Design a protein with these regions (language model features):
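Active-site diphosphate/adenylate-binding microenvironment
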Residues: 22-27, 94
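Structured binding elements
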Residues: 109
Length: 110
């Protein structure tokens, strides 16, 4: 998938990398759809996010989990009237829900 977003993917040295790294970013690029949901198609069961609480509790999210949960978050935000180009301040102190909500907001273009 990286070939979709980089003009060159193989480099001969660090200097070559620094001089020739160039991103391809489509005008309608949406991280949630173009990257995360694509990974959900390619590797749905691979761990995409490992969240750890201050108490050591761990929650693992696969790419498919993130797709499904961010779809739900997007639908919820949309039901509140949030849409494309809306500004949203999201404050969730070190909670895994921040990632789900942020991807959902990306899907709306908010």
């Amino acid at each position: 998938m990286i070939e979709r977003f980089l003009k060159q993917t193989h480099f001969t040295s660090e200097q070559d990398f620094k001089e020739h790294l160039e991103f391809i970013i489509p005008e309608d690029f949406n991280f949630a759809y173009d990257v995360m949901d694509e990974w959900a198609k390619i590797k749905p069961d691979h761990v995409a996010l490992l969240w750890t609480s201050e108490r050591g509790e761990e929650i693992r999210f696969t790419y498919q989990d993130l797709k499904e949960q961010s779809d739900k978050a997007a639908a919820y935000f949309q039901s509140l009237g949030i849409g494309h180009d809306d500004k949203v301040m999201l404050i969730l102190k070190r909670h895994y829900q921040w990632w789900l909500a942020m991807l959902g907001l990306h899907k709306l273009g908010a």
